[in-house]
Structures are given as C-alpha cells and as structure tokens.
Amino acid sequence: MTEPTITDDIIKAHGFTDDEYAEVNKILGRAPNYTEMGIFSAMWNEHCSYKSSKKWLRTLPTEGPQVICGPGENAGIVDIGDGQCVVFKMESHNHPSYIEPYQGAATGVGGILRDVFTMGARPIAAMNSLSFGEVAHPKTRQLVHGVVEGVGGYGNCFGVPTIGGEVRFHPAYNGNCLVNAFAAGLADTDKIFYSAASGVGMPVVYLGAKTGRDGVGGATMASAEFDDTIEEKRPTVQVGDPFTEKRLLEATLELMASGAVISIQDMGAAGLTCSAVEMGDKGGLGIRLNLDAVPIREDAMTAYEMMLSESQERMLMVLKPELEDTARAIFEKWDLDFAVVGETIPEDRFVIVHNGETKADLPLSKLASTAPEYDRPWVPTDPAHDMDAVPEVDPIDALRALLFSPNYCSRQWVYQQYDHQVMGDTVMSPGLGAGVVRVHGTDKALAFTSDVTPRYVKANPVEGGKQAVAEAYRNLTAVGAKPLATTDNMNFGNPEKPEIMGQFVGAIKGIGEACLALDTPIVSGNVSLYNETDGTGILPTPTIGAVGLLSSMDDLIAGTARDGHVLLLVGDTNGHLGQSALLAEVFNREDGDAPHVDLGAEKRNGDFIRDNRDWIGACTDLSDGGLALAAFEVAHAAGCGITLDVGDTATLFGEDQARYLISTSFDAAEALMVAAGRAGVPLATVGKVGGASLRIGTSEAPLADLSATYTNAFSQTFA
C-alpha cells in the first residue's frame, strides 16, 4: 500500500508545530515518510514526551530511604520491609473517556494495571478519581454511567479490589471529564523487573493480544484540545478485554519466574512505538523490528497502523534467547500470542521493516531522551483574597444542603458497582476514608487514598498543591497508617496559555514543598494537558495518590463512635470559609483565597494521631465541609447522634487544614489532653456522642433523616 504524500494538513493533523517539523527534517537530513512522521508525532507529543512539564517535574522530591524506584519506570516502588515492596502509579485516561466513556474508563484501568504487573508485582488494589460536569449538563449522566460501568466492568472481571477514590462535579468539566486510575501491587524486592534493554542481538518479543486498528493515534489525540470534530476521534479510543488481561497477568508473572526476561515494557500510549523506543533508549541500544511477525487481527494493516495502534493487553520483552522455547510454551498455555518481532542492535537506530521494505530508519535517542523540551512562558496566579461577607446560616439546613449535593453525599451508588472484596484481603472498603488492604499472609496492611480540591488550586495553585498532599497525608493518618510516598496525576488545560502554565508551576511548587515536609516523595505520576474544549479549560486538578503502611494490624484505627464518647478536635480552627464547600453549595460562590497549609502543623498533628492511636476510638480528618460535615460522617458511621457545642457558621463550616475529629471515651480523652499538651498540639472538646439526633447549637434534626438524604441523594440523581 502506497503511503500518503506529506501535506501541510497531514503535518498539522499530527500535532507538529512548524519548528518541530523543521527539527525533524534537520535530524533526518531529509523529509520523513508517513510512517516516520507518525512515529515522531507519537513520541514528541505531550502524552509521551512531557515536553511542557519535564522542566518542572524535575523539581519534585523523588528520593527517600524507602524509595526503591522513583519516576521514569512504569511505576514507582517503595520498600515496606520483610523483603517486600509496593508498586504503584496513577495515570489519566481523560480524553478517551469523554469520547467513549465505557471503553475509555475500562482501558484506563487496564493500562494502569499493566504498569504495575510489568514491574513484577501482583495487583492488590485499585482506585479512581473521577471529575464530571454539572449534573444538569446533557452529557453528564451518560458519562457517569459509562465511566462507572467501565471502571467496574474491567476491574471486577480482572479480579482486583477497587477500594476507594473520588467523584466530583463542576461546570468546568462539562467539556472534559477526568478519569484518573490508580493501581498498586506487591512484589519481592529481589524480583523487580525494569524496562531498559540490555545485550546486543537479543530477541525482542511481542506478548499478549493481537494488534488491531483501535487506538491508532490515541496518544496524539490525548495531547490536543477538543473541538466540534470530537466524534471523528472515536476510532482513536482503545477497546479492552479484561479476561485477556487476567491471562496476560498470570502468563507474565509465570514468565518472570522462569528467568527468561531481560527487560519488559507494557504497550500503552503509542503502542509498539513507545514501548520499543523506551526500552532501547533506557538501555542505550537500538531496536530493529520486523512487522511481518507482529500478530494482527485485521487484514492489510500498514506499518503506520501497526506502530501506532494502541490495542490493549500487549507487552514487549527482551528475552534470554536460550529460554525462548520455555517462554513460548508459557504463553501458548495461556492462549496468548508470543512472537519474536525484532532484535536489539548496537547502533542508535530505530529500524522498521514491513513486507521486505524499510518503512522507518530513525535515530532512536532523538525520539525519546533528547526529544524537544519547552520552557513555556507562565504567569503566577494572583491569589483571590477578596471575599464578600458570609451570612450566618442555620447549621442543620446548611448541612442538609451539603448532604444532598452530588459532591458530598454518599458515593454508595458508585462503589457498589465495584468489587472491593475480591482477593479476600480488603480491611476497609470504599466510603470509610482511606482504603486498607492486608499484605497477604502477614500482619501488615497498606492504606491508599487519592485527593485534590480543584477550587483551592484555581484560587491559589501553591496552597492548593500543598493541600492535596496534606489531605492525602491526613486520610492515611486517620486510619493509623504511616504515609510512605505519593504519585501525582497533573490534569490541566492548555500549557501554551501563560495563565494555565502558571497554575501548573504553582501546583508543582506546592506539591513539592508538601512532599518534602511530610516525607512522602513522588515516585511516579502522569501529566495530562490540553484538557480544554473550544478554548474552555478544566479546573486545575493535580490529583495525589498516596500509600501508607500499617506495620501491624494493631495499628489500625477503625473504630466507631459510641454512646457516651467525647468528641475532640485536633488542630487550630480559624474559620476559613474562602473556596469552601459551604460557599459553593449554599451560596453558589467560589470566592476568597484557598486555606493556607501549615506543613509543620500537619506533621505534628499527624504524628500525634499515630503516636496516640491506642486512645482513639474513631478518627476522621477535616476537609470539605469542615467540622459540621466531619461530625455528621462520624455520626452516620456509628448510627448514633452527636451534639456539637459550637454554633457559628465559620467555626462549623470553615476548612482550616491540619485537623482531625476524634471520638473516644472520657478517660481516654483526658489522656489525650495530657499528651497533646506535651506535644504542642491544639486539642479541644467540641461535643459528645449520644441520642438519635444531630444537634448543633440550637439547631437539631433526626440523624435518620440526615442519613437518608446522604445515602439516597446520588442514586436519586443518577440511578
């Protein structure tokens, strides 16, 4: 088949700027052919190259005594002791999920699972952070149903528990939903597999499902804004098969145990192109591929299509040649394709042969480590300090408004569609703060959470970035876990706009400061830019996934409030209402500055919770909705009423940071008061547990009525 002639329209469709296309010509000393241009386009787009963000990502703290592998591999790796490690990452699948919600979300789950088991880890937990447009928008209902069904359909069939996540709604996501998928797995520290190729003349092997035309150009699509041609992009969305992925997992882990693997990489964005280039570049080698050997499921596929297909459930491996027969037998047993499709070469070349013709001959390093990198112009965000006065409200009426909001009501309708008990090690399920999974066969457990408050980030990117990390830290602490490390998923608009780039730079600064202060280095992550439709961008959404360790199940804080318990508030309360849930849901306002984060207080207060866990009955952190919403959540979980002593609006609904609400016995409360005094931690009695109502000052409502609103609001809207 004759390749298309390169035209200006084709160059533009591949996402090249004039300068970038000129640079390609300069590198080659000639114009690229169609296949070569597709390869350069895939590797130089934002999704694969991080060309607009690399400069700033390098400033993040990525090291620590617990870190085995930081950013740059398929996933981050953190030591959890006893010769074991946790492997984890969060990644976006935003653009595909908006175009084709079910498959976009499903393949997002599949892709992040492969990132984990490619490293030699068996997946043990999944989470997702989902952002949708306003409820009344005509597309929101379809997106919610499709995405939730896609996440559940893939994860449930694969057999990994989905143990937590977030769901939010805001008009800024009307034209771009966000689907951020997280996965974690367990591995032995001496059995980790990396992607860098080594050895000249080693066979390059294709593993897994066959290649089709689905997803061709997906990475390029994910690096561009949406416009009125969005429906034309549907063929760029991948199609997933979770049962094939399950077989691929088992075959891959069995293959690794055989000793046949030199290096291995999953095929994700840009498919065969990106996996081969990354393996060669990291190993300082070239790669020659023979596409005639690639297993295909569609007739007459071109070299361009095979190189850029993003068909799912595929891996690429550099194999020990003497164990080829052993490796082939394993994959044939699992009814998966196994094909030697190339070899490593000493030259810095990426050579593609198809039907006996050389379809591409490119300098491999120019596609990866020496790809373009930009220092985009940026302007700092001017923090929004001005805020109109906030009227006093009836606290129960305001609380009821929050409980009915899709942003703060129960997500039961969502997580009931996810299997969160498969594998039998789930200790704390969705809806109870951080998810907790036992390390199988041990007395240890791992806690997982994902957090961000986009309103804060828009108002003040630095403080919003800090707060995302701090809230993740608090969620882990509230279940008794010691926070270990984080992964970031940076979702932003068009980086060519200085104000958007300024949001990104500010958020990175805040995240870096918080991770450094809280000893939670960033070990993996993902950047998703150009989340805009017709020039309108999303709220800046730097999602933080975090992992914590419970060295013993005795460390777990998993109790509930009981009749007669005292309520204690840890941390300073100053009544910060700027950018609060109260303003957004009750007054339809988003004004004022984001709450500022005292990282020293976060560390002290978190250490206090963990050091005194034996005195704590129930614990939750304070975030959206402040003390009032936290108190309701404690009451709802216990099925027992609560009386709060305070009654003014700012104290009840302010969102000051570094705070926890504790329920415990009177004697334990006295012991905690003494310990807090010694530690220099603010601690105050704010109420008591008992009865069947929620009482706040002079306002009161039956807990059963409030719980019904909270429990049913989401399903009433979306079921």
UniProtKB/Swiss-Prot annotation:
Per the record, the major location class is cytoplasm
Gene3D superfamilies attached here? Answer: PurM-like C-terminal domain (3.90.650.10), PurM-like, N-terminal domain (3.30.1330.10)
Which pathway does UniProt place it in?
Purine metabolism; IMP biosynthesis via de novo pathway; 5-amino-1-(5-phospho-D-ribosyl)imidazole from N(2)-formyl-N(1)-(5-phospho-D-ribosyl)glycinamide: step 1/2
Which residues does the record give as substrate binding sites? 92-95, 114, 238, 310-312, 528
Q: Which residues does the Swiss-Prot or TrEMBL record annotate as the active site? A: 47, 93
> Where can this protein be found?
Cytoplasm
Which reaction does this enzyme catalyse, per its entry? N(2)-formyl-N(1)-(5-phospho-beta-D-ribosyl)glycinamide + L-glutamine + ATP + H2O = 2-formamido-N(1)-(5-O-phospho-beta-D-ribosyl)acetamidine + L-glutamate + ADP + phosphate + H(+)
Annotated residues that bind ATP are located at 50, 89, 488, 525
Binding positions (Mg(2+) 2): 115, 266
Sorted alphabetically, the keyword list is: ATP-binding, Cytoplasm, Ligase, Magnesium, Metal-binding, Nucleotide-binding, Purine biosynthesis
What are the EC numbers? 6.3.5.3
Q: Which residues bind Mg(2+) 1?
A: 91, 526
Domain of life where this protein originates: Bacteria
- Identify a single GO molecular function assigned to this protein: phosphoribosylformylglycinamidine synthase activity
Which InterPro entries does the UniProt record give? PRibForGlyAmidine_synth_PurL, PurL_linker, PurM-like_C_dom, PurM-like_C_sf, PurM-like_N, PurM-like_N_sf
Q: Which Pfam families match?
A: AIRS, AIRS_C, FGAR-AT_linker
- Quaternary context: Monomer. Part of the FGAM synthase complex composed of 1 PurL, 1 PurQ and 2 PurS subunits.
The free-text function statement in the UniProt record for this protein reads: Part of the phosphoribosylformylglycinamidine synthase complex involved in the purines biosynthetic pathway. Catalyzes the ATP-dependent conversion of formylglycinamide ribonucleotide (FGAR) and glutamine to yield formylglycinamidine ribonucleotide (FGAM) and glutamate. The FGAM synthase complex is composed of three subunits. PurQ produces an ammonia molecule by converting glutamine to glutamate. PurL transfers the ammonia molecule to FGAR to form FGAM in an ATP-dependent manner.
Protein name according to UniProt: Phosphoribosylformylglycinamidine synthase subunit PurL
What organism is this sequence from? Jannaschia sp. (strain CCS1)
Which taxonomic lineage does the organism of this UniProt entry have? Bacteria, Pseudomonadati, Pseudomonadota, Alphaproteobacteria, Rhodobacterales
**Gene coding for it:** purL
